[in-house]
């Protein structure tokens, strides 16, 4: 008692339908899975870098909260406040500590590895140790609710930043 049946093993390879044997079909499938995993990983890395960048800005705001509140209060419109936040260089011990962590093997991690793609070099931590806010960070700070200014929230931001950097 033996049953046989035919299979039409056609696959789209480079946009063209092609009849494949089992070996070719498995090879094409594995190549497809590698591409999918690579694209997903790059997407998640980009997303984690963007979130880390926003968290750095929030940490700067929490470290210099009095200056931020004064600038926002004295500005006539949100775009003026945003421009003022972006033009100043900010000193922040907290962000310096967040950016200067060491790897498990003892080497120092390069902060540029965590920069979002397309972010100009003028933003972020400068050679002088001062931090310049980007457009995205300034916008996020202006949209931040006052309840996020508490000490407990600062600990949450630092903890989330560490989690994001561990993912990267």
Q: What is the predicted function of each stretch?
A:
Residues 1-168:
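C-terminal interaction appendages of subunits in large macromolecular complexes
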